Amino acid sequence: MDYPPPLPDPADGTIRRYVIVAAEPEGPRYLHLLHGGIGRPDAQQNVPVVQALRQDSRRISDEELVFLLQPGRMPNWRSRLVAAYLIGIDRRTRFRETVGHLLLSSEVCFSGQAYCFALAAFGDHHDAEMLTAYLDRYLPRLDLRYDQHWALGALQYIDLRLGTSHADRYLAPDGMWERWAGAVSHPPAVDNCRDLIVNLCAL
């Protein structure tokens, strides 16, 4: 696929400032966010990382977030992952459509986890619709092991908040989730993803 040229950096060193952040031994920020690491119960060592992430979520400009996301351009999972976390933590709902589109496109690995978190953090009926659109497209694809478990966990979280039942039809016996999860010997546990989303949204 041919992509248009990347968007220019609106500031000097946006990726270094928000995506990399720390050198060894702490390691780059995106590794702390990968697989929801900062939201796991045993992640007490991540407190400074979370504090810095909160500060940066308020500090980063919309222009810098668009630069990190590079919508419609060559994707980078690291910068997209971090951008989506910053968007979700600061509840920047004006990025809702962009995040939903990137999730549905699923152009690159790992960043879908953060899109699901951001939509869960927004927690509105519109976000539930975007997650169901993703699940309707990708749960029938038993050959694709994308972020279906993250999307379903995020949808369960929104159901808990809104008192809705969007996730129920996927979790029915012999339903779409059971068939997708049963296609591999070690399927992901959707309840674990839901609990992780709960922890992440409480940050």
Residue spans of the language-model regions?
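Structural detector for internal amphipathic alpha-helices that build alpha-solenoid repeat scaffolds
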Residues: V47-D56, L81-D90, G112-D124, R145-Y157
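Alpha-solenoid helical-repeat scaffolds
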Residues: R73, W77, T93, C109, ...
